[in-house]
Amino acid sequence: MTILPISAFSDNYIWTFIDKIAGVLDCVDPGEAGPIIRFAQSNQLTLRTILLTHHHYDHIGGVDLLIKQWPSCKVYGPIDERINNVTHPIKQGQSVQVGSLHFHILFNPGHTSTHISYYEPQQGWLFCGDTLFSAGCGRVFDGTIEELHESLLLFKKLPRNTKVFCAHEYTLQNLKFAHTVEPCNSSVINYMQQILKQPSPCTLPSNIDLELSINPFLRTDKEQVKQYALSHGANSSDSLDVFKVLRNQKNSFK
């Protein structure tokens, strides 16, 4: 099985699992139908499964057309009335079988109130929607900042070699903010230089080990990150207080 990011909109990735022997593909968060339909048709593939992480249009906008094209396609997603056409509603603690892949469902509210992620422990793959980005994290919409903080603490506990398949290409801009927070962090500096030199604009997947070294939202226990937060209005150096300031500062960062 092959994993391929299919681009959508300006910076979305629709992660696809391709099994050419079986003649099928599966995808995560198809915000647009066109790219998936064109890819499937050009490779003589049938869409078997759609996995959804949350209700935002750039993640579910293609579902209607895709299930019209492939009526037998299974659609997994969180229990949320804002998402239509989910054939298999799922929640924390359940699992999803997609071909040979066995995904555990992680409840990760914060970005939205019902956000979930798909974790495949045998392969070490995490499809985290808009909860975690490389060197960053999602904004808070209808979830809470406390929930988002807890969701990222959960990700910190995953094995370090876990590959992180984020839904957006935000890495370079996130690294610029990370460098503002930790100007002496050599991991941030080196990784920024690396991706500026690489020929491909795609920086994903990332991995938990890398994120623990470059992502300020996973580094709220580090002294320089604490000092940055305290100098920008944090009430204390407690992890949640630091996280709140980081998220607020990132919201207005240019």
Swiss-Prot record:
Cofactor binding summary note: Binds 2 Zn(2+) ions per subunit.
InterPro entries: Clx_II_MBL, Glyoxalase_II_hydrolase, HAGH_C, Hydroxyacylglutathione_Hdrlase, Metallo-B-lactamas, RibonucZ/Hydroxyglut_hydro
Alphabetic keyword roster: Hydrolase, Metal-binding, Zinc
EC number: 3.1.2.6
Name of the coding gene: gloB
Assembly and interaction partners: Monomer.
Name the record gives this protein: Hydroxyacylglutathione hydrolase
Family stated for the protein in its record: Belongs to the metallo-beta-lactamase superfamily. Glyoxalase II family.
Coiled-coil intervals: none
Binding, Zn(2+) 1: 54, 56, 111, 130
GO biological process, one term: methylglyoxal catabolic process to D-lactate via S-lactoyl-glutathione
HAMAP family registered for this protein in UniProt: Glyoxalase_2
Cofactor: Zn(2+)
Sites where the protein binds Zn(2+) 2: 58-59, 130, 168
One Pfam short name: Lactamase_B
Molecular function, one GO term: hydroxyacylglutathione hydrolase activity
Signal sequence region: none
